């Protein structure tokens, strides 16, 4: 039988006191899912209607709640997960939930209905609660627990007005459940939004969870690691992102907002295998002694304190480095530069006419102009030129309709964004249709992008367009300009001259689309000062005198 529910004594309640538990539908989903996991469920089904404000339901096949404990379920600080300990000292938490506030908060903010039955119990109990009013009755139900929270904040109009749109809340809920799938991959998961299945996962290992959340192509590019205290997967070096949003960590089964030290430990393990400024995909489950971490420092319990963070970070770094060392890691060769296409010269930019002097380290151009020495980052400059060229060409031709629409795998998060911004994407030639079951159909592509020498072009375009950036058009152009741009080791004098010519025609030649500078300028006076010389020649004015 399940552990009975009891009300915590005041000294324990003070230890676990937290801020507001339920401030949005996402909080309800998280708290109910944690309860299902703590109950040992092997199947968890979540239904969300109206962005969660109309209804959130979580159904599990876990241990259930004994009939005699059901009336206490919506009481504040009533829980089966902690017992009264010493009146001083810290708590040792071994479950995801422990405060006994989730059901109480849900009943205060909306209408709560709970139906539950332990497997060994004859008949189920049903509880309805709204505010402090509680009603319990007998019913029939399968083993497990179903919790429904409806009309959230209906009695709190001020709070209701501050809620995000239904689409935005659904996007965050799907992202949250994706993290639970990644760290609890051995369970059956199902998310339904307004009657439409959004996420379905059958029991699998970490690689299978990556396939569910990020698609089979990503799953095929991850390496498995299993060391004492650290288990999971990390991506091969070719699967990287500019952001760290696909670096996932859990401590004792709890998905957490990782401290920077853990993210840095993973990145450091790649050493020179990882391009600067990029991050890998990783899903890492960390195991520590319960007394060595504290989840009670934030209402959402997603920020935890680790007693020996440096030691944990070192263990993570060694585990990731070991996984990478055990596999051959080969990179694909990038595309080459093409001469700039002729077009009317822009009126803005004011980039000087530079004379190429030489190439340094097959990446930097040394040039002179206006009496000064210029150092040009060829990759950033080429990236800027490609970005502006793609931007000019994007609206000049009708979208290219694919002969056969391509099916692509979408994450639940991407599916939610597709529903938000599908019309905006069609406005500049990108037509993506939701095909159901985590798939999307790519029907048209902007003609300017169709012939770019970018591996997995369609996948890259769709992934970037449905990322979290505020301007999907700009994000797509910036990424497609970066991928084929010149890399270190590809530069020679001929390509350097083409880069300078292309940069001179840019409207904004001074930075790449990601904000990095394209050029550095050194005057002769700067050089003379650095070398301790007392004067310089006024070459810029055509005089050879020392000033």
Swiss-Prot record:
UniProt key word DNA damage: yes
Presence of keyword Protein biosynthesis: no
Pfam families named among the record's database cross-references: DNA_mis_repair, HATPase_c, MutL_C
One Gene Ontology term of the molecular function aspect: ATP-dependent DNA damage sensor activity
Gene3D superfamilies: 3.30.230.10, Histidine kinase-like ATPase, C-terminal domain, MutL, C-terminal domain, dimerisation subdomain, MutL, C-terminal domain, regulatory subdomain
GO biological process, one term: mismatch repair
Any one GO CC term of the record: mismatch repair complex
Keywords, comma-separated and alphabetical: DNA damage, DNA repair
Function: This protein is involved in the repair of mismatches in DNA. It is required for dam-dependent methyl-directed DNA mismatch repair. May act as a 'molecular matchmaker', a protein that promotes the formation of a stable complex between two or more DNA-binding proteins in an ATP-dependent manner without itself being part of a final effector complex.
Stated family: Belongs to the DNA mismatch repair MutL/HexB family.
Cross-referenced PANTHER family: DNA MISMATCH REPAIR PROTEIN MLH, PMS, MUTL (PTHR10073), DNA MISMATCH REPAIR PROTEIN MLH1 (PTHR10073:SF12)
Protein name: DNA mismatch repair protein MutL
Organism this protein belongs to: Deinococcus radiodurans (strain ATCC 13939 / DSM 20539 / JCM 16871 / CCUG 27074 / LMG 4051 / NBRC 15346 / NCIMB 9279 / VKM B-1422 / R1)
Taxonomic placement: Bacteria, Thermotogati, Deinococcota, Deinococci, Deinococcales
């Amino acid at each position: 039988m399940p552990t009975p529910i009891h009300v915590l004594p005041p000294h324990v309640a003070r230890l676990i006191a937290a801020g507001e538990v339920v401030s949005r539908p996402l909080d309800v989903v998280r708290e109910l899912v944690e309860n299902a996991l703590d109950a040992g469920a092997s199947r968890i089904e979540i239904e969300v209607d109206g962005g969660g404000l109309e209804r959130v339901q979580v159904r599990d096949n876990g241990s259930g709640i004994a009939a005699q404990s059901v009336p206490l379920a919506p009481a504040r600080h009533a829980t089966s997960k902690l017992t009264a300990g010493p009146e001083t000292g810290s708590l040792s938490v071994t479950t995801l939930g422990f405060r006994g506030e989730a059901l109480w908060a849900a009943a205060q903010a909306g209408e709560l209905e709970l139906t539950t039955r332990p497997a060994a119990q004859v008949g189920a109990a049903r509880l309805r609660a709204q505010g402090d009013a509680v009603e319990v009755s007998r019913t029939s139900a399968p083993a497990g627990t179903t919790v429904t929270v409806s009309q959230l904040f209906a009695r709190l109009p001020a709070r209701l007005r501050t809620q995000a749109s239904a689409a935005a809340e659904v996007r965050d809920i799907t992202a949250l459940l994706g993290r639970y799938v990644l760290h609890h991959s051995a369970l059956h998961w199902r998310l339904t939004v307004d009657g439409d299945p959004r996420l379905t996962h059958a029991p699998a290992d970490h690689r299978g969870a990556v396939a569910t959340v990020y698609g089979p192509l990503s799953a095929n590019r991850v390496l498995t690691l299993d060391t004492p205290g650290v288990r999971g997967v990390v991506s091969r070096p070719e699967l990287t992102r500019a952001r760290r949003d696909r670096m996932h960590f859990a401590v004792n089964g709890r998905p957490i907002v990782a401290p920077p030290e853990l993210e840095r430990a993973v990145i450091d393990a790649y050493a020179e295998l990882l391009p600067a400024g990029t991050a890998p995909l990783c899903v890492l489950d960390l195991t520590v002694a319960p007394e060595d971490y504290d989840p009670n420092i934030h209402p959402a319990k997603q920020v935890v304190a680790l007693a020996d963070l440096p030691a944990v970070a070192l263990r993570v770094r060694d585990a990731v480095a070991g996984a990478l060392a055990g596999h051959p890691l080969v990179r694909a060769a990038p595309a080459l530069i093409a001469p700039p296409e002729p077009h009317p010269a822009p009126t803005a930019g004011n980039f000087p006419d530079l004379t190429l002097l030489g190439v340094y380290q097959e990446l930097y151009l040394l040039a002179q102009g206006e009496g000064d020495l210029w150092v040009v980052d060829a990759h950033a400059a080429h990236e800027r030129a490609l970005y502006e060229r793609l931007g000019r060409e994007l609206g000049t031709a009708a979208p290219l309709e694919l002969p056969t629409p391509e099916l692509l795998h979408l994450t639940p998060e991407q599916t939610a964004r597709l529903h938000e911004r599908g019309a905006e994407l069609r406005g500049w030639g990108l037509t993506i249709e939701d095909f159901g079951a985590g798939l999307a159909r790519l029907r048209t592509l902007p003609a300017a992008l169709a012939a770019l020498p970018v591996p997995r072009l369609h996948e890259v375009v769709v992934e970037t367009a449905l990322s979290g950036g505020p301007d999907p058009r700009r994000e797509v152009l910036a990424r497609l300009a970066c991928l084929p741009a010149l890399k270190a080791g590809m530069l020679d004098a001929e390509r350097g001259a083409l880069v300078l010519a292309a940069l001179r025609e840019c409207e904004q030649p001074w930075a790449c689309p990601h904000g990095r500078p394209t050029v550095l300028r050194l005057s002769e006076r700067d050089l003379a000062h650095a070398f301790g010389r007392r004067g310089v020649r006024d070459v810029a004015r055509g005089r050879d005198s020392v000033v």
